[in-house]
Amino acid sequence: MLLGASLVGVLLFSKLVLKLPWTQVGFSLLFLYLGSGGWRFIRVFIKTIRRDIFGGLVLLKVKAKVRQCLRERRTVPILFASTVRRHPDKTALIFEGTDTHWTFRQLDEYSSSVANFLQARGLASGDVAAIFMENRNEFVGLWLGMAKLGVEAALINTNLRRDALLHCLTTSRARALVFGSEMASAICEIHASLDPSLSLFCSGSWEPNAVPTSTEHLDPLLEDAPKHLPSCPDKGFTDKLFYIYTSGTTGLPKAAIVVHSRYYRMAALVYYGFRMRPNDIIYDCLPLYHSAGNIVGIGQCLLHGMTVVIRKKFSASRFWDDCIKYKCTIVQYIGELCRYLLNQPPREAENQHQVRMALGNGLRQSIWTNFSSRFHIPQVAEFYGATECNCSLGNFDSQVGACGFNSRILSFVYPIRLVRVNEDTMELIRGPDGICIPCQPGEPGQLVGRIIQKDPLRRFDGYLNQGANNKKIAKDVFKKGDQAYLTGDVLVMDELGYLYFRDRTGDTFRWKGENVSTTEVEGTLSRLLDMADVAVYGVEVPGTEGRAGMAAGASPTGNCDLERFAQDLEKELPLYARPIFLRILPELHKTGTYKLQKTELRKEGFDPAIVKDPLFYLDARKGRYVLLDQEAYSRIQAGEEKL
């Protein structure tokens, strides 16, 4: 009886809300009934139907708006123009560094002056111009102005130097480069290798002797440029908007293509899915050269009229003071930032704010509840999605630890799937028919999304490098002849359809026959050592199978009670997960999104001839960490030291 009622509910939702054809509804109900497992299906239905209906309605709303934008050939500048008309004198952007406030009218005029100036210098629709500067209001005005002209901005990571920086500028085929005065030394380092035809413009404080000789000071040139809207380029909703570069931790950075529809989709799904409001004020301390800061954050300003507070860089000590000063209601985060905030000593400001939502990704389950309760944040809005991916997820109901969900009842509505992979090689595991094998609840698998190029929500725009595209696409995934985007991320789905981020490729290693999760160990070590930054990775040891765990901890003073640490480890971690080697260094290098860079740490290993920082190893006989000198290293290499 209950099962029948549940199926009737699904039927009504599928037909009346999703407007699916009767044949698809009928087959779906049949398969659901046969595979429901009786009471389990009823339990899942009761616990998830409200969530699934809300998620379905959000998806339908965004789809409808996307179709309208497609028909009317709207672009981000056109959508921004309608925002300006709604409230021209409302504050759009606030730059915390100088307390500079820009209204929507001022942002519109600045971006139009950028478009008119570049047009006067010969740039046209389809050309590329690079932006290389730290966070500030002008960053937004620059790429928006380029978009008004149809020029595609290449947003360069400000941490890049020399070869990597030159690679990004060269592969983008930029005709012009706008750099902040704070980046002048980095440009001088590669100036001799740049294309002589590349126009250079410096924004910010002007010191002619600190920039390449051909550089022009942009700010006065923009002041003299017309502030009216230039003639609209022949651009549509699926045309290129700008390029965002990958972090480059596994090689040289790749330019991911962001089209207008992708920018809108990413911002809109977050806005409607997490129930944002036009009067919300967002605190955005994430890099604007990445999608989280520029699309998820700034997108709410340009498309939905919200005020965004921009900070040059994240500061744990100033975070809550800024939120109070600017009356922020939403803060953006990535997982590491939350840990930095929790490591700060308690203070009154952390409970005097008006923040109602923390929006971001990568918040570890182990600190989720502590973060939410300590800082009194009612809603943690966790989402999943890389710049180029077509299978974004949202945790719309704040399920602790989940990065999103997919309906177990109506899974066909959103064509994503977890498929079995060899977790060491990430090779897809296929059945006898050649199709990828879907994972069952509780079974880890790689997240994939079906590619449908005609659907802006399902398309894959990829990278400028076609070779990089081929590595991210697989065929015959859902069915014969189809294509799917490979995220490279391993997730796990529970019985209710919630998805949990397991580990990014390479974030596990095998030791003593067990898989060790670096993220879990890092969280434990960070707490025990009272260090904000701890990197855990596997290193090869001659004569042993797998990789031994090694931890690098950042301690400016170098002080660490290793005897107490070893005792605490015994209580906290199983033997196989305890790091064999320790490295204490002044600081750990991070990417622009505060992810720890482990590649060089792995390469250097535990050889004291290479590593000049203090090294220790876990002496199995003594049960504590002892100094790793050249003599001990030789014994380990010869297999004379038990690990």
Swiss-Prot record:
PANTHER family: LONG-CHAIN FATTY ACID TRANSPORT PROTEIN, LONG-CHAIN FATTY ACID TRANSPORT PROTEIN 4. One of its GO terms (molecular function) is very long-chain fatty acid-CoA ligase activity. Coiled coil: none annotated. The gene is SLC27A4. It is a multi-pass membrane protein. It holds the Pfam family AMP-binding. Keywords: Endoplasmic reticulum, Fatty acid metabolism, Ligase, Lipid metabolism, Lipid transport, Membrane, Nucleotide-binding, Transmembrane, Transmembrane helix, Transport. This is Long-chain fatty acid transport protein 4. GO terms for biological process: long-chain fatty acid import into cell; medium-chain fatty acid transport. Its EC number is 6.2.1.15, 6.2.1.3, 6.2.1.-. Mediates the import of long-chain fatty acids (LCFA) into the cell by facilitating their transport across cell membranes. Appears to be the principal fatty acid transporter in small intestinal enterocytes. Also functions as an acyl-CoA ligase catalyzing the ATP-dependent formation of fatty acyl-CoA using LCFA and very-long-chain fatty acids (VLCFA) as substrates, which prevents fatty acid efflux from cells and might drive more fatty acid uptake. Plays a role in the formation of the epidermal barrier. Required for fat absorption in early embryogenesis. Its main location: endoplasmic reticulum.
